């Protein structure tokens, strides 16, 4: 343990180390030599001692023959050497602020007092030498001494021999009360105090030793060091440490020491305290978890911090080599073997004073100020090579990053190019698809509808022409409508104006081919009704074009659950009527030219109207095969005949009558014969009384709601037309949307028109649908006998909407009938000559139209029978619809209505999880949407009536469902799952009623789709239909509302579930 420099003797701080154990064997004394005693122990090297005598077989199994320690001193070693190699490093650590202790343990007369006296003197000499070398710090040495005699603590520096008490201090540990502590002035003062301690200590004579120590002596030296003011060292704090020099009394046997009386009593206390010390060392060497009896002895209590606490410890065990003390020597070596396994944790004891702290802060402040004044002086010169190497590494790193970024840039550019190419390809495909659809639609419509032309009478020359109409061709498509195909009575496919065949004052319109008696279409109306159509006819061209674009932006929807108010056609002022033009065969002699939408169309009214009646207008379109002069002559002749015919049917002013001329026959003809009949009609100058709806005002057949009478008009649907259900919740809605152009969609449509229909209940609609499914529709065209004196009753008659759900388009046997049954009375005051001429004209037109229609249907029989079994839902699915966008819109609207109508959360969750965007789910979404709208309207109607019981009951049922879900959380979710849910939903784990809070938050924010999705998943998990296979969409109509396994007995709950299930 020798060192070259005393400055290196500073012990470690805060590190664990074991007790340094060394053994010193003394030589044989005079008494042992006089008895011719021989030594049995021998030191073979500096760390090992062996038992030299031969052991018996039984002793070899009990005791080892060799012992190894940190250091072994032979009898030839002096005390200075023992100090230097066995105790100096531990004792000298006190000057660096670490506590230390040095023990001397052994049997009586083994040389403990002799060894400790020399180690104490040598340690003080070294400490004073260190103080003289380090003038930068101020050292203060304090000395105290005590002895433990017969388990009593006595102060060796005081003449008072009364025992002292031991106290426990939380910072210092066990302290001795009223112990004298002297401050050492110098070396001589220390020697004087040692002399006093030697004189005060209890000693006695025994058979083994003439001067035997009868007590345990503890000499304590406390060293405090403080940095001086002129010192520039950063060690500004105060270091405080204590070193203990412990000279234990030797263990002895009464048989050997021949003690009696007081010596025997003293020996008993010594052996008891040494036995406690051995027990503490043995337990500390094995484990520190059990109880360690430090308080069983005053010695172990005082030395508690030295044995296993905050101190460095060195034990010097002394022994005698004589054979007579072999058992005592073996016990000493066993104690030393256990002691070297004990671990201590020494730390530096730092005490910082306020004065030292202030000085340190002032010094730091001055240093920082100097650096701010001269920053250049504080620059640190670094190694140039290391700096360049670091910079090179940074450059290489940056180069790699630049290379990676360049690769990413190239990849991004290539991806952008690919995306642009894909977008261009998609646009080209869309254009090709659109052009293909448009061509196919044009071909379909051209083969489906005839060409008609509108002429006016010569009496309307002085009327003011209205604004022309410009229809954009690209806006007319099967999907260019704001409403569904079921909301339109007439499906107008195209608007084109023939500049060659029509003058600016002529009105071109093409309507679906209908088998209608011409005498049933001769309609007159009141002035008030005609005024509405006058306003409709003066729409600006750009307004019409915008409406056509709006039609293309909306998808077809099902509106079977609502009814729309429809009024009769009013044409006091001739309405603008434009429709699709059929491409006639090249071989047809009467082929007409296709009209274009860019040319203006004028609408005029008769000049010589004597009362508010409506002139019948024939809607046709012909090709100018003759000279323009001849065409004008023909037009004049036709207008004269129209004037004559219309003037012969006067009507009352306030009454709407339907005039039926018996001379006219049904308009039943083939498409080929229809052109011929139109040509013949122009030649004989007989104007047909045909009424056509306006293309931009398809819903202009609306009569005023306050009207009591109207003329009925019965129209029979041709097999080339498809039925459509026209519905609306209120008449005000219809009036607002009456200007919306009709859409094209290849669906059946029912030819219906209703009088004064303002609101239809869904239950009545359901009954109406039952009638549709159970009633067979007429299979033959309506025929009516034409009588000159027949009058029609104009009283109010209901409108019958009848169509079989399975009715297929283009089937003659299943064709539905669009009827406007009318009744009333109208007096016909016409001259017999005019009636005969009109009847002849109508009969010619009727026969021509019938023959033409038969040929047309025969040519299209293949397509009609092919489409007879077409599924209307499949047609709806096959349309070019942006379904994902439409699905999200329907889903959000349904979720919002769920919230408004207080729908059961189980139903919401089941519906939300079942329908996830499949295009075939459109029907179920439409049904659910209409159901919810009806519930909302029912709630509103009940609220207006002062009855809110339905909404209140639904709210109560929803509250009970939330309470039930909170109960299901306790049953079906584990504690860990519930805590995770609470944290995910922002509910504190330390709050009350957490499950109720979570249940109240479910389906509370209907605008957040993430919240809706989480709510549906949780409700589904609690109700048990998330993990199981969901009911198929085909069965959802039956299982419309999910019912939990154990429904509550409450009748309110049952009523709410049933109302949600079957409404």
Curated annotation (Swiss-Prot):
The keyword Transmembrane helix does not apply. ATP binds at residues 106-113. The keyword ATP-binding applies. Residues 574-664 are annotated as: Disordered. InterPro entries: Kinesin-like_fam, Kinesin_motor_CS, Kinesin_motor_dom, Kinesin_motor_dom_sf, NACK_C, P-loop_NTPase. Pfam families: DUF3490, Kinesin. Gene3D superfamilies: Kinesin motor domain (3.40.850.10). Keywords: ATP-binding, Coiled coil, Microtubule, Motor protein, Nucleotide-binding. GO terms for cellular component: microtubule; plasmodesma. One of its GO terms (biological process) is microtubule-based movement. GO terms for molecular function: ATP binding; microtubule binding; microtubule motor activity. Residues 18-342 form the Kinesin motor domain. Residues 351-436 form a coiled coil. Belongs to the TRAFAC class myosin-kinesin ATPase superfamily. Kinesin family. KIN-7 subfamily. This is Kinesin-like protein KIN-7H. It comes from Arabidopsis thaliana.
